[in-house]
């Protein structure tokens, strides 16, 4: 995986500067690849990609997604050791550059326009339907095990959007997903986080302020940050977040 966007033409300098300031840097990584990427081509050649729609559905940066311009993005098969090895092969470049933490998004994974027949596909562990909920742990363990194998002196830090029983052995932190920005949503986070800790993993948190905040944009796009109602919600959510790891 590479920094190909011209906005990050000096990625190594950026990482080094963050470290010079005695801070750590995390990067968002996904479990899916577009057809023009190196991981996609290698995984496809070996039959290690699932065949269903995932995010982003469109190759155009418009909303709602333009289905007439499909992205062709596909999720990889993390149940396969070979696929996990390939994933790390490309990810290891970022590790060598000094990335400190992995924000593993879409470890659910995103499954758009869901059809029940999508679950009838085979994966490296047999029927995808029978092991679907195991998907996040296989993704997280793949990164955790590979980094530990090459770097025993540095703690592996992972933030993942989804969780399965047993995943706590990787020390991964999970958040409750893309949730609405509302008082009702904030109230729900308390029992959600408490219930999560019953799985023997206390490392859970939420999106402070919520994720979908469009209802507060009453004065135009991104105006919610100046909305007193949203500011109050954000402050209270920040107070709650202070007690979440």
In which residue ranges do the predicted regions lie?
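Catalytic-domain carbohydrate-binding cleft regions of carbohydrate-active enzymes
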Residues: 1-245
